[in-house]
């Protein structure tokens, strides 16, 4: 076994180191014979110490490179480059985090602006609602007394309606005095009696004395007040139908009494038939209803009663003045012409007084009309505000309704999503998996059979059914060019990997990037070598001729020392700047965060935000950047 291994190593050495073609390669039996006996030690020494010129150059270059890497200056430079690379990566990460923070801040500002606008709208609506509630309370307070009066009137009307539903029987005309009278008939009879007494008190003194009674006469005022109170009580306590029926019953009684009184003289038929004639002639004409006549009469009575007190006062004053003037004229006993002039002057004064009173009354009516118009405008404005507020409330309710509907639809969709996903998996993924599973098993079986024929390929990772059964899958899969070293392209890739110092299992598609990277390193080293040669040539030409070797060495040592000091100072300055940059990164983040919290983030190009437009905010940002750069420098 060891002999075969030595023969194989000898064959590989002949091909790789000595460049022997594969066709001219000695057979394995010959190589075994060479490795027998003392030839084994000789060939072992040759394999260990004899190399091709290319390998020797590679080893020398590696030794020089390792020695160059072991120098403290190079190590320090590499460490600084690594630190600079790390700091650049950190600065890039900080820039990315700043961008993310700016986006988050912009989103938060937008959300805060929307929340602020929503809060302002809510406050305005709440203020409008409070004002509307105050106005409604004041209006309710002002309408409380009219509402109470309307309720009392409604109760009275309901009582009247309930009483009107009850039928009242008055009995026959002959037996009216024997039975009990209804209350409505008794009240109507009392009102008619008081009315008759009032008319007697009103007409009898006129017939006796020829002058009208004053309203201040005791008997006249008492009868008038009694009649008014009785009529008011009658209309308040009894429905109009009962009052009308009672009046008809009393009219029938009076008619019966008149008939009975006129029957003895034979005048009943003639006198009674006379008023019936126009009734027969006018029966075809449509007459107004009794209710309408009563309402119209009481309306006229109310207007006259309201005007009666003022007119009576004015009449009393004017009567007193007139009586005084008449007495004075009678005392003076003027002539007829002077008397006529006096009467005309008195009439003129009366007419002027009436005209002035009418003018004042018209002025009061105009003021009242203007006040009513002002109240009407205020009510119309209130109505418009109420309608606008109602429209806003309806729009808000509609938005809330749509939001609730959208939320319910989203919840329903979210509830249905797991089931839909499961159904989709059952409908599409499971049949596809079942259809692919036999093919994958067949391919796996074929792959296992091919692996038995290719023992040099490491395909263990491809034979795993699942990633979690054995070891995690490798990041680099084996290449197909590693089938066998005897393949035409495989040998070239194997030689390239050996030259680059890569492991033999490296995939061929990854060799070219590694070769390109090493090519860049080679170019960099060549540039450094040319720079050093130029520095050496410049140094040789700048030195005066004839200097001894010792002085040259001293000058070189002093220059190297000065270069080391300059390099050390430059590295210290760089390290100090990096530390300052790391210390000022939080300050930079704070400044940028403070600026992003300003209201300029919500400014648009066509609007002003806190008195500044978007270009002005950008100018402020540029100025802040310049100040920050000065601070960092």
Curated annotation (Swiss-Prot):
InterPro entries: HAUS5, HAUS5_metazoa. Keywords: Acetylation, Cell cycle, Cell division, Coiled coil, Cytoplasm, Cytoskeleton, Microtubule, Mitosis, Phosphoprotein. Its main location: cytoplasm. GO terms for biological process: cell division; centrosome cycle; regulation of microtubule nucleation; spindle assembly. The modification N-acetylmethionine is found at residue 1. It comes from the Eukaryota. The modification Phosphoserine is found at residue 71. Residues 264-286 are annotated as: Disordered. It is found in: Cytoplasm, Cytoskeleton, Microtubule organizing center, Centrosome; Cytoplasm, Cytoskeleton, Spindle. GO terms for cellular component: centrosome; cytosol; HAUS complex; mitotic spindle microtubule. Residues 73-110, 375-403, 551-592 form a coiled coil. Contributes to mitotic spindle assembly, maintenance of centrosome integrity and completion of cytokinesis as part of the HAUS augmin-like complex. Belongs to the HAUS5 family. Component of the HAUS augmin-like complex. The complex interacts with the gamma-tubulin ring complex and this interaction is required for spindle assembly. Interacts with EML3 (phosphorylated at 'Thr-881'). This is HAUS augmin-like complex subunit 5. It comes from Homo sapiens (Human). The lineage of its organism: Eukaryota, Metazoa, Chordata, Craniata, Vertebrata.
């Amino acid at each position: 076994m060891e002999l075969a291994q030595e023969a194989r190593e000898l064959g590989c050495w002949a091909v790789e180191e000595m460049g022997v073609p594969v066709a001219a390669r000695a057979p394995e039996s010959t190589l075994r014979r060479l490795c027998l006996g003392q030839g084994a030690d000789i060939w072992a020494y040759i394999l260990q110490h004899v190399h091709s010129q290319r390998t020797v150059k590679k080893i020398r270059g590696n030794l020089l490179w390792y020695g160059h890497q072991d120098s403290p200056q190079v190590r320090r430079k590499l460490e600084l480059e690594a630190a600079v690379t790390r700091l650049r990566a950190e600065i890039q990460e900080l820039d990315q985090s700043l961008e993310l923070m700016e986006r988050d801040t912009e989103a938060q500002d937008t959300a805060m602006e929307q929340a602020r606008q929503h809060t302002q709208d809510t406050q305005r609506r709440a203020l409008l609602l409070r004002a509307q509630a105050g106005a409604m309370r004041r209006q309710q307070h002002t309408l409380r007394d009219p509402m109470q009066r309307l309720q009392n009137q409604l109760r009275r009307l309901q009582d009247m309606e309930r009483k009107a539903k009850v039928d009242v029987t008055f009995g026959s005309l002959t037996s009216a005095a024997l039975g009990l009278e209804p209350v409505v008939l008794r009240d109507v009879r009392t009102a008619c009696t008081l009315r008759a007494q009032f008319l007697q008190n009103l007409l009898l003194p006129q017939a006796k004395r020829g002058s009208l009674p004053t309203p201040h006469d005791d008997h006249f005022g008492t009868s008038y007040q009694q009649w008014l109170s009785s009529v008011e009580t009658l209309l308040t306590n009894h429905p109009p139908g009962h009052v009308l029926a009672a009046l008809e019953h009393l009219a029938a009684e009076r008619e019966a009494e008149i008939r009975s009184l006129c029957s003895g003289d034979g005048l009943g038929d003639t006198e009674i038939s006379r008023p019936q004639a126009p009734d027969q002639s006018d029966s075809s004409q449509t007459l107004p209803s009794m209710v309408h006549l009563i309402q119209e009469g009481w309306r006229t009575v109310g207007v006259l009663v309201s005007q009666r007190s003022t007119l009576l006062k004015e009449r009393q004053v004017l009567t007193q003045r007139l009586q005084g003037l008449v007495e004075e004229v009678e005392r003076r006993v003027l002539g007829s012409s002077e008397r006529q002039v006096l009467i005309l002057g008195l009439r003129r004064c009366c007419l002027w007084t009436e005209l002035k009173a009418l003018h004042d009354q018209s002025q009061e009516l105009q003021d009242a009309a203007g006040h009513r118009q002002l109240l009407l405008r205020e009510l119309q404005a209130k109505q418009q505000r109420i309608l606008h507020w109602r429209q806003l409330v309806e729009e808000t309710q509609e938005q809330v309704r749509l939001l609730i509907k959208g939320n319910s639809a989203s919840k329903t969709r979210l509830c249905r999503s797991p089931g839909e996903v499961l159904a989709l998996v059952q409908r599409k993924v499971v049949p596809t998996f079942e259809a692919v599973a036999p093919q994958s098993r067949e391919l796996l079986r074929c792959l296992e059979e091919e692996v038995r024929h290719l023992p040099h390929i490491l395909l263990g990772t491809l034979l795993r059914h699942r990633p979690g059964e054995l070891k995690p899958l490798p990041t680099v899969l084996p290449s197909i060019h590693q089938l066998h070293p005897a393949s035409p392209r495989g040998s070239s890739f194997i030689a390239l990997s050996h030259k680059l110092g890569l492991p033999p299992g490296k995939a061929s598609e990854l060799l070219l990037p590694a070769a390109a990277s090493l090519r860049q390193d080679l170019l960099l080293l060549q540039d450094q070598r040319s720079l050093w040669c130029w520095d050496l040539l410049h140094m040789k030409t700048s030195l005066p001729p004839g200097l001894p070797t010792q002085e040259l060495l001293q000058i070189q040592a002093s220059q190297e020392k000065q270069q080391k000091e300059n390099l050390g100072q430059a590295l210290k300055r760089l390290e100090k700047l990096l530390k300052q940059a790391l210390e000022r990164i939080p300050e930079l983040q704070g400044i940028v965060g403070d600026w992003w919290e300003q209201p300029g983030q919500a400014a648009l190009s066509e609007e002003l935000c806190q008195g500044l437009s978007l270009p002005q905010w950008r100018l402020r940002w540029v100025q802040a950047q310049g100040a920050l750069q000065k601070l960092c420098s």
